[in-house]
Amino acid sequence: MTRNDLLDRLATTQASALETQGLGLVPMVVEQSGRGERAYDIYSRLLKERVVFMVGEVNDQTANLVVAQLLFLESENPDKDVSLYINSPGGSVSAGLAIYDTMQFIKPDVSTLCMGMAASMGAFLLAAGAKGKRSALPNSRIMIHQPLGGARGQASDIEIQAREILYLRERLNTILSEVTGQPVEKIARDTDRDNFMSGDQAVDYGLIDKVLARRG
């Protein structure tokens, strides 16, 4: 399998996932080459430019796709940045942490950009980008809060789930403190309820580094 075939397969899987999420048909791009015309879905073409999309709910399928693309792009060039574009309401904490750990694990810097909404785990991953390379578009909204969860069953089962949620809350607060420079105590207070921010407010808070009105 050639490099282009692998790129196509990775991005086509993502395109299919986005269609499954109800985002409609995926546009195609036609390029001319010495061998004639070649058609790419738009995500395959952007993956060639080292752009990865995280759109919609953060779940195991999303995480698997993003992780696979990050690892592939590292193998292609470990010294060139990867861009992660985020428009997500959040979702699974475990899936989000899988993406976070991979972002830290790979050698290339991962720059992050919020387009539209980065909430919950979406905001967490936005803030987890390389320092100095985290940004948002002017009308983006960013929201942080504590992990959500529910439990059913015997009292002992509910107690176990409650301990796990408290552990995850402490772990996420610690990481947010590291990436924002805010004290853990302040993070805990500010995430007690849904906390919405504009791009400029997110810069002041340390979640991102800049608001981009136009590509530089």
Swiss-Prot record:
Molecular functions (GO terms): ATP-dependent peptidase activity; ATPase binding; serine-type endopeptidase activity
One GO cellular component, as annotated: endopeptidase Clp complex
Q: Does the keyword Amino-acid biosynthesis apply?
A: no
Q: What class of enzyme is it?
A: hydrolase
Q: Does the keyword Metal-binding apply?
A: no
Keyword terms, alphabetized: Cytoplasm, Hydrolase, Protease, Serine protease
Q: Which reaction does it catalyse?
A: Hydrolysis of proteins to small peptides in the presence of ATP and magnesium. alpha-casein is the usual test substrate. In the absence of ATP, only oligopeptides shorter than five residues are hydrolyzed (such as succinyl-Leu-Tyr-|-NHMec, and Leu-Tyr-Leu-|-Tyr-Trp, in which cleavage of the -Tyr-|-Leu- and -Tyr-|-Trp bonds also occurs)
Describe the family membership recorded for this protein in Swiss-Prot or TrEMBL.
Answer: Belongs to the peptidase S14 family.
Q: Which PANTHER family match?
A: ATP-DEPENDENT CLP PROTEASE PROTEOLYTIC SUBUNIT
Q: How does it assemble?
A: Fourteen ClpP subunits assemble into 2 heptameric rings which stack back to back to give a disk-like structure with a central cavity, resembling the structure of eukaryotic proteasomes.
Describe the function of this protein: Cleaves peptides in various proteins in a process that requires ATP hydrolysis. Has a chymotrypsin-like activity. Plays a major role in the degradation of misfolded proteins.
* Name assigned to this protein: ATP-dependent Clp protease proteolytic subunit
Give the taxonomic lineage as stored in the record: Bacteria, Pseudomonadati, Pseudomonadota, Betaproteobacteria, Burkholderiales
- As recorded in Swiss-Prot or TrEMBL, the protein's gene is named clpP
